[in-house]
Amino acid sequence: MLAKATLAIVLSAASLPVLAAQCEATIESNDAMQYNLKEMVVDKSCKQFTVHLKHVGKMAKVAMGHNWVLTKEADKQGVATDGMNAGLAQDYVKAGDTRVIAHTKVIGGGESDSVTFDVSKLTPGEAYAYFCSFPGHWAMMKGTLKLSN
């Protein structure tokens, strides 16, 4: 009898939905200079957050490369401008730029890359932006990242 009751409790608990935080996101880029997501939400209970970037287009990275760069909203334009001068060899991100919270490498069609960053780098209430720093892309390929409760 006790075994049946224990089994019933275990099976009931196993059927409950898992409420763990989602500490990763996948974003796609394409040959039309677009991301498929305009917003990402990071649960503040996550210690780290991973972004998986996939280029679903066909063009090479020298012609239509994309990356994913995270900064404060106020720093976006300056980081993008400085990134253009850094060049493809630096993934269009100025070396040592402390305004950059995280970034992937520049990828071409059919490629993917991931980046993981510490959520402790994010401040509640701060406005964050992500964008592609490939020259000419940042004005179109952008979105917001929010820290949630």
From Swiss-Prot:
Keywords: Copper, Disulfide bond, Electron transport, Metal-binding, Periplasm, Signal, Transport. The keyword Transferase does not apply. Cu cation binds at residues 66, 132, 137, 141. PROSITE patterns: COPPER_BLUE. InterPro entries: Azurin (IPR014068), BlueCu_1 (IPR000923), BlueCu_1_BS (IPR028871), Cu-binding_ET (IPR050845), Cupredoxin (IPR008972). Transfers electrons from cytochrome c551 to cytochrome oxidase. This is Azurin. It comes from Achromobacter denitrificans.
